[in-house]
Amino acid sequence: MNIRQQLVQLLNLAMVLSTAFMFWKGLGLVTNSNSPIVVVLSGSMEPAFQRGDILFLWNRDKYVDIGDVVVYEVKGKPIPIVHRVLREHKVTNKDRKVRQLLLTKGDNNPTDDLSLYAHKSNYLDRDEDVLGTVKAYLPKVGYVTILITENKYAKLGLLGLMALSTLLTRE
Amino acid sequence: MFNIIQRIQSLSNFYLTVSILLCIVTTVVSIISMFLDETSSIPAQLSNVVISTNLKYSRSFGSVGGRPKENSKILFDLDMDLAPLFNWNTKQLFVQLVAEYPTSVADDGAKVTYWDSIITEKKYARVHVNKQRGKYSVWDVSDSFQGRNATVKLKWNLQPYVGFLFFGQTKGEIEVAYPAT
Amino acid sequence: MHSKFRWVCVDTQFCTHHQNLSPFSYISNPSPMSFSYLEGNIDFKGQELANRITKKLITFGAIISFLVGFLSDNILYTVYTFAAFGLLTASLVIPPFSFYKKNPVTWLPKKSKIEIQH
């Protein structure tokens, strides 16, 4: 009897997790972005974005406009960066395809992002590097995730709370 | 609700739900008020815009392989009042002085920023600068601007406390030419 | 003669609480006094009241907070007002006040032998 209960509880947990996963992936499909919701990690866009703010991305625009805030990932560096488009150019490739090249800069940074880009590139490629443009914003809600990943006391505290709650509900 | 823990859970659950609803209502009200305020035609007075160019040879100024790259700088006068954009949901305004010039590739051409500024409060929304120097030394993907004609305009971005970001442009563009090479 | 002892599960928490024990033992021996005091239990009418207070107060607080912020042109007032309403509701609903315990449940008298029929 006990094992069955445990299995049912496990099944419920699996249902909750897979529903959340489906929602996340579905949102990624709609917005055409790998990570449609991001948490701001650095202060490079202050005073507009603070650490812990939540950004909603949209990636279905063919071209990014100047002044848009984009989230991009440089090839080879796994950290996504949220900065504003300073300059945009369009060039044609050898195979007649039009690429959009972008130069970005964080509002709170003194210089543009040239030093952050891949070694030989002077610009970002809209199709390859940009994860999406920021369309909507929610303040401070994501600060919990930052606390958990960076603060070891918060991590222990959360684990303690979770352990406590599983113990108490089972009586 | 019979247990303290249950009451805490139920209360925080409901509070969170209502908070989210409040955010959504604020967002919708912001969209409606932006639409009603006719923020698409705020006048701006751009005058005495002068673009100057010189050649640079370092990578931080766009030079590739040591070849000379034409860099440009701007000098301008600007007079505008962006106070109508400041509502209860405005966190900051980001304004950019943008030059748009034709390229052989696209209809709308390339867009570059010469100067930007952040306005955080309504009392600073009145911008009046004379002989202002641009912040950035701007270069094109090609080696030179080749004396093209550019349209210089002022774009703004409204950052809300919660909701959608709004973008717009002031009324008052000016045509300038890059100096001939 | 079979005598069926029927009981209705009012709250699932009550039922899962004592799953390991015999199904009727909860009625004959509820939680000891000290434990239920720590849990902050309140009776059903009190739960209804607490539920109504949270829903009405928080909804009202949301509307007031929105108006305060909108009319004073400052969104921070919305945040502060709504936080204040949240704290007010929490202080009214979470502690087990005596006005939540006005209608206690009357349990059936304890029997010396309980006849269980499969």
From Swiss-Prot, chain A:
Domain of life here? Eukaryota
Q: What is its EC number?
A: 3.4.21.89
Q: Which SUPFAM superfamilies did the record assign? A: LexA/Signal peptidase
Q: Which GO terms describe its biological process?
A: signal peptide processing
What is the enzyme's class at the highest EC level? hydrolase
Q: Which reaction does it catalyse?
A: Cleavage of hydrophobic, N-terminal signal or leader sequences from secreted and periplasmic proteins
Q: Which residue intervals make up region (C-terminal short (CTS) helix)?
A: 157-168
- The stretches that face the Lumenal side, renumbered to this chain, are 25-171
- The membrane spanning regions, by residue number, are 7-24
Q: What is one GO cellular-component annotation here?
A: signal peptidase complex
InterPro entries in the cross-refs: LexA/Signal_pep-like_sf, Pept_S26A_signal_pept_1_CS, Pept_S26A_signal_pept_1_Ser-AS, Peptidase_S26, Peptidase_S26B
Which key words are in the record?
Answer: Endoplasmic reticulum, Hydrolase, Membrane, Protease, Signal-anchor, Transmembrane, Transmembrane helix
Drop me one GO molecular function for this one.
Answer: serine-type endopeptidase activity
CDD domains in the record: S26_SPase_I (cd06530)
- What's the family? Belongs to the peptidase S26B family.
What UniProt notes about the protein's domains is: The C-terminal short (CTS) helix is essential for catalytic activity. It may be accommodated as a transmembrane helix in the thinned membrane environment of the complex, similarly to the signal peptide in the complex substrates.
Q: Self-association or partners: how does it assemble?
A: Component of the signal peptidase complex (SPC) composed of a catalytic subunit SEC11 and three accessory subunits SPC1, SPC2 and SPC3. The complex induces a local thinning of the ER membrane which is used to measure the length of the signal peptide (SP) h-region of protein substrates. This ensures the selectivity of the complex towards h-regions shorter than 18-20 amino acids. SPC associates with the translocon complex.
Question: What role is this protein assigned?
Answer: Catalytic component of the signal peptidase complex (SPC) which catalyzes the cleavage of N-terminal signal sequences from nascent proteins as they are translocated into the lumen of the endoplasmic reticulum. Specifically cleaves N-terminal signal peptides that contain a hydrophobic alpha-helix (h-region) shorter than 18-20 amino acids.
Full protein name: Signal peptidase complex catalytic subunit SEC11
Q: What is the lineage of its organism?
A: Eukaryota, Fungi, Dikarya, Ascomycota, Saccharomycotina
